[in-house]
């Protein structure tokens, strides 16, 4: 009978991938990123271990949404104080902090526990085409 092999933390190999968000649809891009962050693209995927890779996203300000979402999609946040609800449209958030749009979309697709928070830390999102991770030799992710 075959035994299921659980990878140890020492044997997990982490690669660096580069994703260009230019002219990509937000949700479709986020699902591919979340899959790589979780490690579901690897044969050694284990649900309770962080087997995923690092992902660098560039050109975050050029990500697209379909339909009227650019003018109608709302992002809500709350300061925790009474009356502290802030609501912002996709367009204004894309001008102000485009990295947050991709981060929030991917974060919602990861597990909502300590493992998901650990996997989310391996996501690096940048406005523009430059990133400080050239030393890691990131491989372009086919998407």
From Swiss-Prot:
Superkingdom of source: Bacteria
Entry's Gene Ontology cellular component terms: cytosolic large ribosomal subunit
Keyword Ribonucleoprotein listed: yes
GO biological process, one term: translation
CDD domains, per the entry: Ribosomal_L13 (cd00392)
Matching InterPro entries: Ribosomal_uL13, Ribosomal_uL13_bac-type, Ribosomal_uL13_CS, Ribosomal_uL13_sf
Gene Ontology MF: a single term: structural constituent of ribosome
This protein's UniProt keywords: Ribonucleoprotein, Ribosomal protein
Family: Belongs to the universal ribosomal protein uL13 family.
Assembly and interaction partners: Part of the 50S ribosomal subunit.
Function: This protein is one of the early assembly proteins of the 50S ribosomal subunit, although it is not seen to bind rRNA by itself. It is important during the early stages of 50S assembly.
Name recorded for this polypeptide: Large ribosomal subunit protein uL13
């Amino acid at each position: 009978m075959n035994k299921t092999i659980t990878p140890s933390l020492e044997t997990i190999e982490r690669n660096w991938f580069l994703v260009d968000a230019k002219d990509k649809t937000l949700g479709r891009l986020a699902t591919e990123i979340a899959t790589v962050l979780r490690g579901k693209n690897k044969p050694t995927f284990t649900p309770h271990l962080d087997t995923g890779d690092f992902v660098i996203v560039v050109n975050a300000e050029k990500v697209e949404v379909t339909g009227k979402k650019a003018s109608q999609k709302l992002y809500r946040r709350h300061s925790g104080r009474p009356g502290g609800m802030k609501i912002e449209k996709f367009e204004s958030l894309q001008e102000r902090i485009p990295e947050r749009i991709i981060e929030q979309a991917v974060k919602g697709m990861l597990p909502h526990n300590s493992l998901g928070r650990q996997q989310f830390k391996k996501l690096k999102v940048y406005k523009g085409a430059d990133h400080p991770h050239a030393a890691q030799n990131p491989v372009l992710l086919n998407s």
